[in-house]
Amino acid sequence: VPYTALPFATAISIQHQVPLILRRKEKKEYGTKKMVEGIFHPGQTCLIVEDVVTTGSSVAETALSLQEEGLLVQDAVVLVNRGQGAERALSQKNIRLHSVLTLPYILQELLSEKLITQQIADETKAFIQTHQSP
């Protein structure tokens, strides 16, 4: 997903010795002029890597771009899932979302370390519940 998760995706690529491809935000007028950059072949499976998801729309847009190039997209991994409906939205597009951390978990850890108050944790949870994606 352009471009915030690039360091995370690069680390995964290096650690697991798998190719890295990148979806651009917009097509450049120079170079390859492609939206999807990297070495790949139609029919290959691709894992989407994202830093934070809220609604899942960025992951869905990336999946569509990759599918248009002939790649198979079944899974996405995210560093932080805010818990606002991305998992549900992506499952409707047959994409499994795997979260390293969830916002409720982060809140609980911050609370247990006394880095936030119960009031802040409760207000944040209430905000998440009232601001779910459709």
Question: Which sequence ranges carry the predicted segments?
Answer:
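Short, glycine/charge-rich flexible loops or terminal/linker lids adjacent to PRPP-binding catalytic cores
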Residues: 8-47, 55-61
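A generic "binding-loop/recognition-motif" signal
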Residues: 4-5, 26, 83
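PRPP-dependent phosphoribosyltransferase catalytic core
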Residues: 64-134
